[in-house]
UniProtKB/Swiss-Prot annotation:
Keyword Cell membrane in record: no
Chain sites annotated for binding sn-glycerol 3-phosphate: T13, R83, E84, Y135, D255
GO biological process, one term: glycerol catabolic process
CDD domains associated with the record: ASKHA_NBD_FGGY_GK
Provenance organism: Haloarcula marismortui (strain ATCC 43049 / DSM 3752 / JCM 8966 / VKM B-1809) (Halobacterium marismortui)
Keyword Oxidoreductase included in the entry's annotation: no
GO cellular component, one term: cytosol
Keywords: ATP-binding, Glycerol metabolism, Kinase, Nucleotide-binding, Transferase
Lineage: Archaea, Methanobacteriati, Methanobacteriota, Stenosarchaea group, Halobacteria
Protein name as annotated: Glycerol kinase
Residues annotated for ATP binding in this entry: T13, T14, T277, G321, G421
Transmembrane segments: none
């Protein structure tokens, strides 16, 4: 009998990856395709959902072919995705009515400020655990319904999108729901993605009627919410579709929750930080939804079939790896691999601080009008100093979150598990350990996001029996311990606070 595997579709901000894992959690196949970033106006970011679906089919087909694995050898498919990014599509045709509004998109900042002025921020936080921000799906869905050009279709000539939504002709969802719909024909999301919409009550674990009304989203538009690892399955791929097989689709997690799962952070107090486009620090808080006094989000971590939901505290940094991309954009570096070498070539930043608030600041500051800032430059400043300051900014932002996390949870962290593209950079890992004065553990399989969704899907179909099997799979690649004096780290971090202050509240309304 041929070996069997679990597949994972990892639909990220910059591209789509398909990976296949074996029983020991090792990578068998890996294919990747970038998609276009669309910037119609400053602060606006869109993706084409059709391109994403086409790329998904392409990477799945290519990944299987390259590894010599047949679709019939897949016991299950899991999905993980960039969270909050929002799509509205036509129920009948399956066609999007507008490009996806990406999580980084700031076009609804004015609407968020309106909500703040109406004193509804605490009301929203109480229900959703979220800070009221343009980051989440609620204001994005509202914007699409109010502003997208209606599709000129026979059935809807003259009818605007709001009317069509009220008539039950439109569906909305985050990327996981879009992919599950395209793969299985079912309109389903998981608890972790639902918890990021700002429309879902994380205490009652259901769509919140008052929030749906506040943002003008009819209940007929929202997907059914299921566990992240679902024994009753989200559906099967179509035997007549691109895979030519009925593969169970059984697991879904927003990317950061998937990384928490993939890092086997199954117990209260376990924490991980993922360094991708942004950086996302999550701590499992068990069956208690811990409210934050420090600008962190209370969110759903994950849920397995028949088990209580596990909550998490989350700190979201909007720009981490994207700050390194910016160094490339402005020709300070040729590629990301150069950053460590350049940063090491100088002993310090020579007083330069870089605050990468290109799309505002996330936790714990939540300032949508903050903008990217470099301070402390002199005529002696060289590009090496700016590169080093950029890497340091990632470490400082993480310390912002680590301190908030310890204060809210009362749990002192001993080791932080890290993953994501940027952790291949040893210089950054060591710097991170120095700045937060904590041990850093990097696992052997660094694509933990895809691994987490594969684990969720595999558990649902019995490919793995228990989470203990998954814990045994987790292997450390390298550990980093603080080498910097704590006093020096504190001093450097205090100046970071000053630099952040200078970036705040910069963007003006036109």
């Amino acid at each position: 009998m041929a070996d069997t595997y679990v597949g994972a579709i990892d639909q990220g901000t910059t591209g789509t990856r398909f990976m296949v894992f074996d029983h020991s959690g090792q990578v068998v196949a890996n294919a990747y395709e970038k998609h276009e970033q669309i910037y119609p106006e400053p602060g606006w970011v869109e993706h084409d959902p059709v391109e994403i679906w086409e790329n998904t089919q392409e990477v799945v087909t290519k990944g299987l072919a390259d590894a010599g694995v047949g679709a019939e050898q897949l016991e299950a498919l899991g999905i993980t995705n960039q969270r909050e990014t929002t799509i509205v599509w036509d129920k009948e045709t399956g066609k999007p009515v507008h490009n996806a509004l990406v999580w980084q998109d700031r076009r609804t900042t004015d609407r968020v400020e309106e909500i703040q002025e109406e004193d509804k921020v605490e009301w929203i936080r109480g229900k959703t655990g979220l800070e009221c921000d343009a980051y989440f799906s609620a204001t994005k869905t509202e914007w699409i319904l109010d502003n997208a050009e209606p599709l000129k279709m026979q059935s809807s000539r003259g009818a605007d999108l709001r009317e069509r939504a009220e008539d039950g002709e439109l569906l909305m969802g985050t990327i996981d729901a879009w992919l599950i719909y395209k793969l299985t024909g079912n309109h389903i999301t998981d608890v972790s993605n639902a918890s990021r919409t700002m429309l879902y009550n994380i205490h009652d674990m259901e769509w919140d009627d008052e929030l749906l009304e506040e943002f003008g989203v009819p209940e007929s538009m929202v997907p059914e919410v299921r566990p992240s690892s679902d024994e009753s399955l989200y559906g099967h791929t179509d035997a007549d579709g691109f895979l030519k097989e009925e593969v169970p689709v059984a697991g879904a997690l927003g990317d950061q929750q998937a990384a928490l799962f993939g890092q086997t952070c199954f117990d209260k107090g376990d924490a991980k930080n993922t360094y991708g486009t942004g950086a996302f620090y999550l701590m499992n808080t068990g069956s208690e939804a811990v409210a934050s006094d420090n600008g962190l989000l209370t969110t759903v971590g994950f849920q397995m079939s028949g088990e209580p939901v596990q909550y998490a505290l989350e700190g979201s940094i909007f720009i981490a790896g994207a700050a390194i991309e910016w160094l490339e954009d402005v020709d300070l570096i040729n590629n990301a691999a150069q950053t460590a070498e350049l940063a090491r070539s100088v002993e310090s930043t020579d007083g330069v601080y870089m605050v990468p608030a290109f799309t505002g600041l996330g936790a714990p500051h939540w300032d949508g009008r903050a903008r990217g800032t470099i301070v402390g430059m002199t005529r002696g400043t060289r590009k090496e100093h700016i590169v080093r300051a950029t890497l340091e900014s990632i470490a400082y932002q993480t310390r912002d979150l680590a301190e908030a996390m310890e204060e809210d949870s009362g749990v002192e962290m001993t080791t932080l598990r890290v993953d994501g593209g940027a952790v291949k950079n040893n210089f950054l890992c060591q710097l991170q350990s120095d700045i937060i004065q904590t041990d850093i553990a990097r696992p052997q399989v660094d694509e933990t996001t895809a691994l987490g969704s594969a684990y969720a899907a595999g558990l649902a179909v019995g490919y793995w029996d228990t989470v203990d099997e998954l814990r045994d799979n987790w292997q450390v690649d390298e550990e980093f311990s603080p080498e910097m004096d704590a006093g020096k780290a504190d001093k450097m971090y205090a100046r970071w606070d000053d630099a952040v202050d200078r970036s705040r509240d910069w963007a003006q309304e036109e």
